[in-house]
Amino acid sequence: DMSEEMLTVAQQKTMDLMPRPFFSCQRLERLALPRAVDLAVCALDSLDYITEPKSCREAIRQVYRALNPGGIFIFDVNTPEKLRAMDGQVFLDEDDDVYCVWRGEFDRQTNICSYGMDLFQRQGKLWSRSFEEHREYAYSAETLVDYLKQAGFTKIAVYGDCRMAPPEAGEQRIYIKARKGIIK
């Protein structure tokens, strides 16, 4: 992940796991690991945040290089339909200690969805305000499968949102699994 904060949260949540998961803060398109791995998981639309298609293609190549023969790459992305539908929408999420409002904009020329999030968090009797800017590229399943094949992946499967079945029309998120070929 590119976020030290997100990696810290992930490490805290996996402290009791054995073997301990390996976390690394680096750009996926320049992925360098100390040794090859059997499984790579890229979750929470991480590939969507790579807003240059050639960089996404390179990231997938780097994951391929980082895997042992027979290794598996699993990732999820928001569907283009979901990102397009966010255009002009305002979203609100609140509970007793957090208030979040954000507005989405989709640029059909660049295929990028941008959204700014205003986050208000209660701290005692006061509220603190922070702002986050997000940009996600709308990759189609077909494009990603093509990138995987170009990198050398085989046995590529595309699944619907949290189902071990092909995606249906209007799906919000898809999951993709691919295997690095075994050298004979």
Predicted regions and their residues:
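Class I SAM-dependent methyltransferase SAM/SAH-binding core
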Residues: 1-31
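Conserved SAM-binding loop
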Residues: 4-5, 47-50, 58, 68
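A short acidic, Gly/Pro-enriched loop at the edge of an enzyme's catalytic core
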Residues: 29-40
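Short aromatic-enriched loop/helix-cap "lid" or pocket-rim segments at secondary-structure transitions
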Residues: 36-37, 85-89, 170
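A short SAM/SAH-binding and catalytic strip from SAM-dependent methyltransferases
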Residues: 38-55
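A short glycine-rich, Lys/Arg-flanked "PGG" loop and its adjoining helix->strand segment in the class I
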Residues: 55-72
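SAM-dependent methyltransferase
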Residues: 74-145
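C-terminal lobe and adjacent flexible extensions of AdoMet/dcAdoMet transferase-like proteins
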Residues: 135-184
